[in-house]
Amino acid sequence: MVALTDPDLLFPPEAHSRSLARDLYAGIKDLPIVSPHGHTDPRWYALNEPFPDPAQLLIVPDHYIFRMLFSQGVRLEDLGVASLDGAPVETDGRTIWRRFAEHYYLFRGTPTRLWFDHVLAHLFGIEEPLDATTADRHYDTIATVLQWENFRPRALFERFNIEVIATTEGALDDLEWHKMIRDSGWEGRVVTAYRPDAVVDPDFEGFSANLDRLGEITGCDTGSWAGYLDAHRQRRAFFKSFGATSSDHGHPTAETANLSDAAAQELFNRIRRGSQDERERKLFRAQMLTEMAKMSRDDGLVLQIHPGSWRNHSPSVFQRFGRDKGFDIPTRTDYVTALKPLLDCVGLERDLTVILFTLDESSYARELAPLAGVYPALKLGPAWWFHDSPEGMRRFREMTTETAGFYNTVGFNDDTRAFPSIPARHDVARRVDCAFLARLVAEHRLREDEAHELARELAHTLAKKAYRL
């Protein structure tokens, strides 16, 4: 597979710049992986059991894959995606794999193709392209090695040279898998992150019951504003005891508010009573982002804001299959106006880190880079989700560096559920950054020694610093 094994993958076609990119990449390609934000399952590392069949490992959990197939008429149930009503779905891994292989051509030119080919070649030693004619052969190869000890989760963690990985758990999670990891004596560093969406977003399903549960597990009165905030503080401390260095917030917008305590208390009371006023529900989410930022100022958790996704765009798919089924769509997102209440409150705090992400690329140069380029509390997260492709990463660097520089960004995070693809995702990011730095050197805008230093920072150091790992 020349596209994957070629040493010049994603490097500039011009000879001088390509040579520079090669040298930069050679200096960083084997650096440890810092994965400060993602969605791998801590159960894997806790139990360290063999992964299931190839389809359950590589296809069924990956919405990058099944959303593309669904767009071309393949039913989710035919890909093994479980329905909420318990209706029958395909359970035979080989059948699912064959269906995927028959449609693999759909991924030509996409980052998913790059990542998946990398996994086939570098993890499983497969050199033949995947298609209908090779599907069974590849399935058998992968199914066989998945039973080997050196393909269990902890062994792969070590083989991937992962220095630290963060999972993401909801505020109500008991973190039993993280406790099991800690008690096992295994030295792999797996930390959690605090994701309170289910107890800060009134539109989240079961919100009122979630707040009741939050009160039960903390002993706080979540019927009162003060007790509700205390419950968050207690849960954040609990998550920190299992290594958390960050919280994560997936709000529909970046809107924030900074109400007086009396106004916030009254708003909370109305929300707790089940207010259906959309303006009040939006205002509550906005206020809670600011409250979370103030808590981060006090307890040191890095605050990540992932706004601008219209979640569950298809109500029929959501009702049948639930969340995270490929129907989250980017929207236009305002930051300058939306974040001002939060920034007025804590934006000048030098010991606070708020990492901003976007699905709206038009905001890079107009809003995000100028904001992060002046407010001490702000940093820019890397190209995210729909934009963590080679083209998206290039656009990110080109549109933010001139105003925010490199050191107001946080390196790379893979933000994935697909554990086997983590080395591929980091490799693509490292190659893209080396190509970008090589261009700056070739244009005499950067010295070569500076480019080597920056390559290491972007691949490893900036993520460790920003996420306090």
Curated annotation (Swiss-Prot):
Superkingdom, taxonomy of origin: Bacteria
GO biological process terms held by the UniProt record: D-galacturonate catabolic process; D-glucuronate catabolic process
GO molecular function: glucuronate isomerase activity
Known pathway: Carbohydrate metabolism; pentose and glucuronate interconversion
Identification of the protein by name: Uronate isomerase
Family (UniProt): Belongs to the metallo-dependent hydrolases superfamily. Uronate isomerase family.
One matching Pfam family: UxaC
Matches recorded under SUPFAM superfamilies: Metallo-dependent hydrolases (SSF51556)
The keyword Isomerase belongs to this UniProt entry's keyword annotation: yes
Lineage per the UniProt record: Bacteria, Pseudomonadati, Pseudomonadota, Alphaproteobacteria, Hyphomicrobiales
Organism per entry: Mesorhizobium japonicum (strain LMG 29417 / CECT 9101 / MAFF 303099) (Mesorhizobium loti (strain MAFF 303099))
This protein's UniProt keywords: Isomerase
Catalytic reaction annotation: D-glucuronate = D-fructuronate; aldehydo-D-galacturonate = keto-D-tagaturonate
InterPro entries (UniProt xref): Metal_Hydrolase, Uronate_isomerase
Enzyme Commission number, as recorded: 5.3.1.12
